[in-house]
Amino acid sequence: MDTDELRARFDRDGFVIVRDFLTGQAFEEVRENVERYVRDVVPTLGPGKAYYQEKDRPETLKQLQGMAVDPFFEAYRQNRRWIDLAEAILGEPVEAGEPEWFNKPPKTEHVTPPHQDNYSFNLNPPNV
């Protein structure tokens, strides 16, 4: 992976796609823990932590917030592989916030309008 090229594309386009960043066992570990979290933890969460396109249809789960309540995801945000990639692309030190998960189930009609993440984060300086 050429991080200089990724950084140049990020600077030019404002985003990058990193293909095959997680593969094999690393991917399986995350996939299995997301499935476990959805199955075992989500039913215990209070309001505002899990969002569905249609509340009565679990397969329409579209967003999870506050995932640091789970030890796997709390520890995972310190994964050096992610941090090193972010720092290489952004060109500055990064601090991983609380893990969140976003999904667009097939045939989802919910659109995410343009927005500024720092409206919620309130970082100063606003490096998000």
Regions of interest found by a model, annotated:
Residues 1-13, 19-123:
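Non-heme Fe(II)-dependent double-stranded beta-helix
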